[in-house]
Amino acid sequence: MQLLHIDSAITGDQSVSRQLTAQIVEAWKASHPATQVSYLDLVADAPAHFTMDAMAPRTGQTDGLSEAQQRENAVSERLVSQFLAADVVVIGAPFYNFAIPTQLKAWIDRIAQPGRTFQYTANGPEGLAKGKTVIVASSRGGVYSTSEGGRAMEHQESYLQTVLGFFGVTDVRFVRAEGVAMGGDAKAQALAAAAQAIEAHVKAHAANQDRVSQAA
């Protein structure tokens, strides 16, 4: 089993989402010892924002690419191939200004490739990255999930659910720690709830795998 571990928080050791992704990967490896992990730090190794040089190979232009276009295409190919090879993807996605970090959005822009992660058909778009499990470590300084007003400002989990679904990923799970900037007690409670969610998600996946194996 191949697991891709992605972090996108800019705050390093102070990052809650990085703490959570590390816990998720550790729990996953304990439950699935044969798992092989690849790590992608989108801050240390950030893809450039999407440009026409990055877009050029996707428009059917395959011959006569400039050096810049070749470089950008190599970055995109590395990232989309890494994503497609993974059975499980763990994504650290902190809540920045009501959305995700630009580093994470730049990664999504690189892997959103027609013919690779999705295609358009007579019946509409079809995702091509089916069969994956994605676990998102979602961290928020405030609380946005418990009120209509808060949910209206949330473009983090909702966006990731949408774009991953567009790629064909139907098994998307969220480990949420919110209110982590609202005092020590609130942060401790959020982290405890997230730890319980991690345990539940990993156990549920293992139980489902056992059922599939027995049925086979």
UniProtKB/Swiss-Prot annotation:
Cofactor: FMN
Top class in the EC scheme: oxidoreductase
Its EC number(s): 1.6.5.-, 1.7.1.17
Annotated positions binding FMN: 15-17, 139-142
Origin: domain of life: Bacteria
Assembly behavior: Homodimer.
Family: Belongs to the azoreductase type 1 family.
Role played: Quinone reductase that provides resistance to thiol-specific stress caused by electrophilic quinones. Also exhibits azoreductase activity. Catalyzes the reductive cleavage of the azo bond in aromatic azo compounds to the corresponding amines.
Name the UniProt record assigns to this protein: FMN-dependent NADH:quinone oxidoreductase
Species, as recorded: Acidovorax ebreus (strain TPSY)
Lineage, opening ranks: Bacteria, Pseudomonadati, Pseudomonadota, Betaproteobacteria, Burkholderiales
